[in-house]
């Protein structure tokens, strides 16, 4: 069965490789139940509701009742009808000894449009079972015993299971010349819109190939099942299409319509059917979906093979077609399913111009098993279909041999099954088409246009070879055109329904009115429209496609959501008064008041597209390479300019057609420079300047600029003098997220980044005695879970403890009564407020209590102290916890009275202070009221000192201050919670440590040390015990591996796995803890520190700013990003990183312009340097910094944005143990954690964000 041009010729839509969908897909799909919400944007916003309803219907009734499905024939192929001449049957030679196979000899046949296999006549898309009454005579239990010995192929002898040297000569001699276009595949439509074409149409017949012109195929493995298939001349059924509209469509890594091979899967479900599998997949497509399913009776394609699917993990998804074999249970059904799979696989290979090449033994080729992908490529850990095939006494090698044979038959290299071997051609029976196709060359190309069929026409053609067309009533309607075909002097268009995509057929060029069309784009704009204006179901619609008319009196509001250009006219789709449809923009009036352009209108505009102009407040620097300055946006070409690499003000932006322009002017004067194209500038948003009166210190040598964000061409001078100088600022402006100040220093004026300024140290003041009391606790009702620092005593009579605030019934809380616990979280639910109690070690949450059942006080920050005290005669004893009850006493008051208490830390509880220390060789807490200090020590206030460290803000309920210890000038930290805070100064006032530094928005502020943390650790409950998850891992078919002897891998046992997975143990290790580091969270490591680390790292040296920008822009941990780049570039020394150009498809390393690739993106193994540079050139990475920032988007989407965002999750996947795991080595996460920890040590930083799973 051959694929048909109607469906399978790729449209080859051009993709912008920078951030293209080749990596945007859910890279781990089919291996884990990750959230796929990042792909929801593939749904057309105007059709979400409709497609959702359609999806429900499709799932409820998949691929059924479609016996009237249309069949579209390949325009390039005329199919012969097989005759029943019994003389000289070209049956395939029987079992050939595997020793004959020469794995180094490969048949290099090219794709051809010849196909001698007929399509069976059928009135249903479900092909009838072939030979249903055949017994299992060919099957014996003996085969089960010697499956391995008989059918096992020596990987040293064979690479591709059907490529003997003997056949190579025969096939070359007999092979026809390959056509320029690969043969497409035949398809069926699930919901035909017209009945012009019948699914039961008799295939056309032509004179057969001479019977002696083709050799017999010699099987390369012994297979009773393959012999059974050949002997019974089993035919594959038609390919049914059951596409689902809401499945995403992403390109393969090489582009749309460019898969690199096919992967064999089995469903691993003995009790499911093909309909059941498809229905399940549609309901769970966010986790996985494949291209097709095959069983003994049907081949159902569920997703277009021109686009990737989510079936084989991160590495394989962008490369391969994925097809599932549905389990069957008897000999004949299994044989039919193997025949069907082999036919479908051979069809795909033929169509896409690929040759069979098994990847099973070396990881290179076009035919893969899921196991081979797991073994050689990774990104998945499945091992199918080997187990299922073995259960039927079959093997992959036998299936590959069948695929190879099918391919050679389709390519006209070997004789089809059942054909006669004499040279007498078969006689065609009642051909409906000429006995021989046109000798004219056929060319087919993708098209994106629209057409209306004229009332007088030649009809619709099933293929472009048809002598006559079939009459049609689909005239004077607008259809989408998806392909153009030229055969000889005739040109045809393939027309389809605009909204559903259902194919109608081919029409001659002279029978239509054709217009070019651009792809629709989403818009959000309102217009006014007159009553009575007609809406249409399609753009450029006719009177037969009216969707309704605008009702009401007076102008109505038309809300447009989509726009498409047909020829030079614009059509918009939208809604008005409850009716939706398309209307020409000529009937609409923009409700927004247009802003006049600042330049004269041209006398002869070059386009009819509407010009939109809007005010803008930004700044831009013109790139060294640009299209020049434009006097008006209508100008065809710009004028060369020397005003490059300078910062200008941007006052307006304009859009005309597909181009966007900025109007740039001199920053300090009203002088207009001209219009520049968007791609020719580096643009940043800017806020309006504001006047300030502030004084800073600035270091000598700091450069001043004539404009904010100025370049080296706009320097106004440098700060003179020795020692810090005083900079008096009078103006401030924010550019993007950076603050620039204009001021004067030593008689020079100019702009400088706030990062180069420091606030002068405040004069010392006398400070009051520190207060030990903490404000009394008051109940608040947070709407979300809040992190708090409090302490609580559980009342004897309480309503119980809850695992969640949503639990209606609490469990008995008697064992917690009359005890003190730490409170870490607080949440309101309904009219009640609950708090989360933790045990005395702070680490283990116990459950939620209603605050009505507690006595709660605020808990201060623990402060280190070194002091000896004498315990008063009357005291409350030594307790396990501050403010502990009698049930938590370690030593009674009598046991510690008059003793010496050595305190090491203290904490405030409400108005009391508790000290922690040692007495009588026991440690615990004592109320400060029960202690007497030998002498009172008056606290002192330290001067502010330099202190460089990046903390994490941990208290969203806290405040940041303009000056420390101020009760008035303070602002909420809620917006900055869990964000980094880069500290530059430290000061202690009244016993409280304050830090001065930069918030994530660039603002400088003071924050209490109690509101900061060196690291932010979050614990997530898995809902399982450690024993449970370890048992799952240890019980996998492919066991976790361990090296007990260096270089020798063995299966890890249960105890090995449990030890490796123990998160409590790992979290205590300072290095191994880094396997919990969040790789999707930037840490704001300073550029200086990054540059220090990158010193001597080749072209990556001094690229700290680029890594910092990339981390912030795409949400990636800087250290992880840097480690990735160092690994890929050999510490920045590879030629790929140093840069080159590709000219005439050759790498040029000494070119003036070089393109860089620092992450090895698209550097495929066959030619990594050329391919990697080609990708970089297409992406425009002509500097190392561009390669870092641009490549980071790829890295983020491909690796750390797929849900498993820590090394531990990558290795063990605690959310779904045993599935989608990156490695089998139980030490993999430990090794990589130590590497990343080592990088942090070299940079002089520590990890900030950790996510630790917890087991019950």
From Swiss-Prot:
Residues 173-196, 421-439 have a biased composition (Low complexity). Residues 199-775 are annotated as: N-acetylmuramoyl-L-alanine amidase. GO terms for molecular function: amidase activity; mannosyl-glycoprotein endo-beta-N-acetylglucosaminidase activity; N-acetylmuramoyl-L-alanine amidase activity. InterPro entries: Amidase/PGRP_sf, Amidase_domain, GW_dom, GW_dom_sf, MGlyc_endo_b_GlcNAc-like_dom. Its EC number is 3.5.1.28, 3.2.1.96. Residues 1-29 form the signal peptide. Residues 103-151, 173-219, 419-440 are annotated as: Disordered. Undergoes proteolytic processing to generate the two extracellular lytic enzymes, probably at the septal region on the cell surface. It catalyses: Hydrolyzes the link between N-acetylmuramoyl residues and L-amino acid residues in certain cell-wall glycopeptides; an N(4)-(oligosaccharide-(1->3)-[oligosaccharide-(1->6)]-beta-D-Man-(1->4)-beta-D-GlcNAc-(1->4)-alpha-D-GlcNAc)-L-asparaginyl-[protein] + H2O = an oligosaccharide-(1->3)-[oligosaccharide-(1->6)]-beta-D-Man-(1->4)-D-GlcNAc + N(4)-(N-acetyl-beta-D-glucosaminyl)-L-asparaginyl-[protein]. Keywords: Cell wall biogenesis/degradation, Hydrolase, Multifunctional enzyme, Repeat, Secreted, Signal. Residues 443-517, 519-593, 612-686, 688-762, 784-859, 861-936, 943-1017 form the GW domain. SMART domains: Ami_2, LYZ2. The keyword Secreted applies. Residues 103-138 have a biased composition (Polar residues). It is found in: Secreted. GO terms for biological process: cell wall organization; peptidoglycan catabolic process. Its main location: secreted. Residues 776-1256 are annotated as: Endo-beta-N-acetylglucosaminidase. GO terms for cellular component: extracellular region. Oligomer; forms a ring structure at the cell surface which is important for efficient partitioning of daughter cells after cell division. In the N-terminal section; belongs to the N-acetylmuramoyl-L-alanine amidase 2 family. Endohydrolysis of the di-N-acetylchitobiosyl unit in high-mannose glycopeptides and glycoproteins containing the -[(Man)5(GlcNAc)2]-Asn structure. One N-acetyl-D-glucosamine residue remains attached to the protein; the rest of the oligosaccharide is released intact. Cleaves the peptidoglycan connecting the daughter cells at the end of the cell division cycle, resulting in the separation of the two newly divided cells. Acts as an autolysin in penicillin-induced lysis. The GW domains are responsible for directing the proteins to the septal region. This is Bifunctional autolysin.
